[in-house]
Amino acid sequence: MKFGVLVSATVLAARLAHAVPTSIADAIMSRASRDGIDLSVLDTMPDILAAITDTYNERGVQYPQDDRKKAARVGSRGVGNIFDIHAHAEPDWYRKVAPFTGGNADRNDGGGTPSPAWNVSSHLDFMQTIGISHSILGFTSPSANAFLGDKERTVALARLINEQLAAYARTYPDSFNFFAAMPLPYTDEAITELKYAVQELGAVGVALMSNHEGHYLGYDSFTPFWQAMDGLGGRQVVYVHPTTPWLNVNETWIPANPYSDIDESRMEFYMETARTFIDLTLTQTIHNFTNTHFVLPHIGGAFPTMIDRVLKTVHTELYESSLEIYRTRFWWDSASPTYFHQINGLLAYDIPKANLLYGTDYPFISAAVTAADFDSIMAYPGLSDEEKEDLLSNNYKTLFGDKLHFQ
Ligand SMILES: *[C@@H]1O[C@H](CO)[C@@H](O)[C@H](O)[C@H]1NC(C)=O
Ligand SMILES: *[C@@H]1O[C@H](CO)[C@@H](O)[C@H](O)[C@H]1NC(C)=O
Ligand SMILES: *[C@@H]1O[C@H](CO)[C@@H](O)[C@H](O)[C@H]1NC(C)=O
């Protein structure tokens, strides 16, 4: 009898597993077509929809009907209370689209770092090792910009990335939230995706690349996007991730990196962070959209080094107002080895310690290196024990406010 119950439960589960995929895929496709997006331009669409469906089915979670205004739930899974704001999802289907980080689908020349294998269970294991209870997932470079110059595929890829991220966040609500990918430089489509990701899928912010098809974030055509975001109501969080410095020369995309001896993520990503935040400053994008807060990767990369250089020589009129913004609406993640020495350069600008956040860059930085980085934070003499605890487990609460509901 017991055996019989077990069999019928298994059969039922199999039937459900068979029935549910179609409906999730249908729902995703019908919302995409409602928003003018043709997902079928990606020839891997069926695999991607199957992967997203599998994510929901792992724990029998429903596809979101409407997440509007629902604050995401954040728990502490009892493994420490550390919050990771710089963490990447890298599902197998995405590694097929973009095998190299910083490269793109048509560029298998090894110019980027080969994207590491990743899955939810290895990510959860990693979190357990470090004592991280919650991670905000985003896709790393090239994110939705894997098909340079191809609007339809960029827009479709952004949508599917966001559906996949929402599936992780829905399925593991105590462990994950997400930053949505945006199909810039296509501003109108990015505004549509922004509203969908934030209002319907429940993204806690957006992840922008340092440049989108060679355009830095202060680019004129992006202003309506900043306007739309700032006008969504309440605080908006923009996480910026460095990417390859793309130049379009004579209709050909080339990475503007004359130094090819090490991969672009090592040095160019720091330069990229500097370029785009200088651009956001000089165009006064950061001045004009006052609801918008920025998370800077790697405690700003090479950006802090450039501040005096640029704003004490040219555009001196922006110096004080910019520093004021860097000290209030800018937040600085610790990802990769930043607390051995680099942190001193940032803090020299009187950046409040309450704006320091913890980030890992997993899976691009291994658990062993992350542990060493963690130790360097703990050994850093410039922060008190309380300030270190806040960096790891509290400052993000001030950043996200009512976007996250703390258990
Ligand atoms: C997840 O990734 C880890 C590390 O790459 C691997 O050992 C493991 O087999 C993977 N698990 C699944 C379910 O794919
Ligand atoms: C651009 O392409 C045209 C036509 O192929 C060629 O004549 C020209 O030299 C190219 N310019 C550069 C800068 O490569
Ligand atoms: C911000 O406002 C200033 C005027 O105060 C204007 O000159 C500048 O172009 C604006 N920049 C953006 C990106 O809106």
Give residue spans per PLM region.
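Fungal secretory targeting signals
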Residues: 1-22
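Mid-to-C-terminal alpha-helical segments outside catalytic/metal-binding sites
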Residues: 20-81, 92-134, 163-170, 192-196, ...
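Active-site gating loops and adjacent loop-to-helix segments of metal-dependent hydrolytic enzymes
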Residues: 33, 55, 79, 91-117, ...
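Hydrophobic faces of well-ordered beta-strands that scaffold small-molecule active sites
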Residues: 83-87, 135-137, 177-180, 206-208, ...
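Histidine/acidic-residue-rich catalytic or RNA/ligand-binding cores of hydrolases
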Residues: 93-96, 249-257, 300-315, 342-347, ...
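Active-site gating/metal-coordination segments in enzymes
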Residues: 139-276
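Short acidic/histidine-rich active-site segments
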Residues: 241-242, 247-249, 294-302, 335, ...
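Aromatic-lined glycan-binding groove of carbohydrate-active enzymes
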Residues: 281-327
